Amino acid sequence: MHANEIFDEKEMPVRYLGYATSFRGEAGTYGKDMEGIIRMHQFDKMEMESFSTAETSHDEHLLFSGVQEYLMQQLRIPYQKLQKCTFDIGKPNAKGSDIEAWLPGQNKYRETHTADYMTDYQSRRLQTRVRRTSGEVELIHTNDATAFACGRAM
């Protein structure tokens, strides 16, 4: 989407909110309990993406986490927030957190949202950069987070 693009620093951060019907390709995982989340073959979700400078990227991560919590609070869905350990965050991420909603029918919390703080991992491959007001060009930082996974949270 922004491969080989250079943003002006004053344009940052750039944020997107997208809605999509997603499909899982993993055969045989539908309905299975996989590390605290129930896999669904098809699901609808809203996803947040952010392109920012190194100085503001952690604030973007906190903003996305805050949006997730706000939505759960507005819907009055009991939840807990977890900071993921290094083993669970995946290769591109420097930091990650999950929101788990309380599912009374299962008498347990289940993952419904995730937020990933990726620093410049994605922009290195994409060569997505920012031109500072000083003229220096450097890699941007990226964040992504589930705004709302309709089937999971409801």
Regions found by a protein language model. Give the residues of each.
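TRNA-recognition modules of translation machinery and tRNA-sensing kinases, especially anticodon-binding
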Residues: M1-M154
